[in-house]
Amino acid sequence: MRLLMIWLAMAFRAMAVELPPKELDCMEKNAYFEAGNQHYEGIRAVVAVTLNRVESDIYPDSVCEVVWQKYQFSWTHDGKSDIPANKKQFAKVKEHVAHALRDYKGGYKLQNSMWFHNHTVNPKWAKHKRKIATIRDHTFYGDH
């Protein structure tokens, strides 16, 4: 039984998008600051957008470069600490990110969504995009 459990754990891990530690840290922080107050679906959507950008030809080729690209994610230029304050919540986000990476490799790409915004703002760029989904307090978009 123990051998079966080990094999299943290894197989499950092999099905996930694998990121180097620094890239994973950028992804986890992006998920925490953008959707850390949300359930799994919101975090999974932020992970999908981030990876969709990495895979696209119009954004940088790494998670950290996508996350830290100027004015792409609000938390990276808000003047506040980039260290997650709520360690318990950050631990939960890390779990959700791990699951989201498996979902992404399994085909969940939120219809190739590349942009999102919080409902508290109304960005001009949104009117030029195709609305794909609303998940909690975020709306996600793709190209027309």
Predicted regions: what they are:
Residues 1-9, 13:
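Sec-dependent signal peptide recognition
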